[in-house]
Every structure is written in C-alpha cells, then in structure tokens.
C-alpha cells in the first residue's frame, strides 16, 4: 500500500520524537511491504522563524494533499521565547488551531491506557490502579468556547471580557456518531459529558446525543456532568470506555486522564475529519527544556503513528505490531527517564526508537 504522509516536526523535542516514529514506520513498511512517502510541512515556531507566520497557506495546501499528517510538538518557552512577544494570532499554537479548522478536524481521540508495567507510576491508590483502565476520550475540536466570538471592552473604568460558547445540532450529531462508532469497536459503552444543569449548549448536546444513541442499541450510554466526571476519573477510571464531550471539557478531562496513567509521554492523539484524513500527534507538549538532549520519550508519537495506520489507512495488523512492540519493550524493562523505575534499563530517545523498530 502506498501512503503519503505529511510530517510536521515542530518545535522543542518535536524533531527528535518524529524521527523515531518515522524509524518505526519504516520498519513497518519493510516488514509488510508498504510504501510510506513523507513530505515536510512547517508549522509553529519553526514556521515563524522561516516565514513570519505560524502556518502559511502553502503549508495548509500541502497538508490537504496528503493522506494523513504526523506531528511532533508545537511551541516554546512562553517566558523566554521571542515567539511569545508576538500578537496571539502569530504565536506557534495559533498555527495548530488554524490547521485544525482548515482541515475540518472536528473529532479528537485521546486514549488513556494504564500499562501493567507502569502501574507503579500511577498516582492513584493501589486498589484503584491495580484494576487498570483503558478509555478513549472523544473531544469535539472545532466548535464551542475556543472558537466562539470574544471581545474585551472598557466602559466607565470597568474592563469586561466576553467569550461565547456555541454549538449547532449538526456539530453535535457528527461528533456523537463518531463517538458511538468508536465505542462499537471497543467495549460498547459511551459516557456523554456535559453541564446540562447550567448551560443551554449542554442541554442541546444531551438532546442530540440521546437521538444518536437510538441508532446504536448495542451501545450502553449514560450522561454525566463534567464536574462529576472529573471526580470519577480519579475515583474509578476503570468504569469508562468512551468519554464523549465538547471542546473545553474534553481539553481538561483528557489532560486529567493522561496524568492518572503516570506519564503523558506514553499517550497518543488523533484528530479526524469526516473522511479518512487525520492529524496524529502526542498528547504532551514541546518540552523545550529537554530538547536536543536525547532524553525525550518518543513512545507517544510512535503510538500516534500506530493510530494513523489504524484510522487513516485501515492497517489494523500493522498498528497492532507497533502497539505490541511497545508492550514488549516495557516488559523487557527498557525505560526513558520519565518512566524510569528501579531495576529497569534507562535508554535515550533514539535508542528507544531503535528498540521498537527492531521489535516490529
């Protein structure tokens, strides 16, 4: 199979971790007789340095011409980087928001899985962590508060800021359908998270989710208020399969879920549109403080590449091969510094990539 993959290396540790993901993808291509072609795309700080913009129209057009895009990380040190002296719409992260909108990437998938080899890194009580958990957070990505109208005004010496949260039934229906479709391939349970006791947008969210649920009689579903969900994620994460929610709630809950796994360096992410196209990236940031030191954990990016094979190319067997390689390396007690524990062998970013490529 021939696959055209856009590559955004990005900032900070981005180039290092993407290189290791490509190393593993090349091992997959060799074993399973595929052809993966890579095209570089500039975004974020590296694009600002080269073009003065965090994302150019040329970069968007190049991304649209690919079958999928694999990304490292975007951004720098907000205190010291000159990028953050620019206007907000010219900063690195603005490029990512623009790309998501331009590519209509409305569905964000963030798995949170506790590997049994990493239970010791989980911050939860042992009676909770020993049960393990395996959930998928499905976050609506192009609507809601982050994309609503906003303004700040000063009248009579009082400054007031406004942000608007808007969702249409069309936006809710398409993300709900995607969430239920994902649940059908998992344990067939959806928890729809909202704030319907306060927000009109959440009341519409709940109404549309209930309508969509009727088309999936095999899927168990429930509604949960976002504050309760935040509590349940630390009280009993094993209860969740697919968490379906809007943009801001998903942003917060997915970060919370990532931390109860013990290392955000292990967690992948996919952003999908209504075709097979997707943007795949690690859940963690650019970690500029450790960039260039060969100590970053590339596993989240490598697992993002596995998600790309599964969701954009329907290469389930190949995705399984990457995921099984990660499990094997953990069982063999190889660790990067962020997940290091007593009795294990510490390896750097490039060595971890080598080990995983060899395990394919």
Where on the chain are the PLM-derived regions?
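Glycine-rich phosphate/diphosphate-binding loop of Rossmann-like nucleotide-binding domains
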Residues: 6-23, 28-29, 155-227, 239
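N-terminal beta-loop-helix "entrance" segment that forms/cooperates
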Residues: 33-57, 231-233
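Buried hydrophobic positions in well-ordered alpha/beta secondary-structure cores of metabolic enzymes
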Residues: 11-14, 67, 138, 179, ...
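Buried hydrophobic packing segments
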Residues: 21, 25, 209, 301-312, ...
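Extreme N-terminal starter segment of soluble prokaryotic enzymes
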Residues: 1-5
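N-terminal glycine-rich phosphate/adenylate-binding segment common to multiple enzyme folds
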Residues: 49-162, 248
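Glycine-rich phosphate/nucleotide-binding loop
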Residues: 45-48, 233-334
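Glycine-rich phosphate/pyrophosphate-binding loop and the adjoining helix
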Residues: 142-143, 147-186, 190, 196-198, ...
């Amino acid at each position: 199979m021939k696959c055209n993959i856009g590559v955004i290396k990005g900032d900070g540790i981005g180039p290092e971790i993407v290189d290791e993901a490509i190393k593993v993808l090349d091992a997959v291509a060799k074993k399973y007789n595929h052809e993966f072609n890579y095209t570089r795309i500039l975004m974020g700080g590296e694009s600002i340095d080269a073009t003065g913009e965090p994302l150019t129209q040329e970069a968007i057009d190049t991304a649209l011409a690919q079958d999928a895009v694999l990304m490292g990380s975007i951004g720098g040190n907000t205190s010291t980087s000159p990028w953050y002296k620019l206007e907000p719409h010219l900063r690195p992260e603005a490029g990512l928001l623009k790309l998501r909108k331009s590519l209509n990437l409305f569905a964000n998938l963030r798995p949170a899985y506790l590997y049994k080899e990493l239970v010791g890194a989980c911050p939860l009580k042992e009676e909770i962590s020993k049960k393990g958990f395996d959930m998928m957070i499905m976050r609506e990505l192009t609507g809601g508060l982050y994309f609503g109208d906003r303004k700040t005004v000063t009248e009579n010496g009082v400054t007031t800021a406004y942000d608007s949260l808007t969702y249409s039934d069309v936006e809710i229906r398409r993300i709900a359908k995607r969430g239920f479709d994902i649940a059908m391939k998992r344990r067939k349970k959806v928890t729809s998270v909202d704030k319907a006791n306060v927000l009109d947008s959440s009341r519409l969210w709940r109404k549309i989710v209930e309508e969509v649920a009727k088309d999936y009689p095999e899927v168990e579903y429930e509604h949960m208020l976002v504050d309760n969900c935040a509590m349940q994620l630390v009280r009993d994460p094993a209860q969740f399969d697919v968490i379906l929610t809007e943009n801001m709630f998903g942003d917060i809950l997915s970060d919370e879920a990532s931390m109860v796994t013990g290392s955000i360096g292990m967690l992948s992410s996919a952003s999908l549109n209504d075709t097979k196209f997707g943007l795949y990236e690690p859940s963690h940031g650019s970690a500029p403080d450790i960039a260039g030191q060969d100590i970053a954990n590339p596993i989240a990016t490598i697992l993002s590449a596995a998600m790309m094979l599964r969701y954009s190319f329907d290469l389930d067997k190949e995705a399984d091969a990457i995921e099984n390689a990660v499990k094997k390396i953990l069982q063999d007690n190889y660790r990067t510094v962020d997940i290091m524990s007593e009795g294990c062998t510490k390896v750097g970013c490039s060595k971890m990539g080598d080990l995983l490529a060899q395990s394919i």
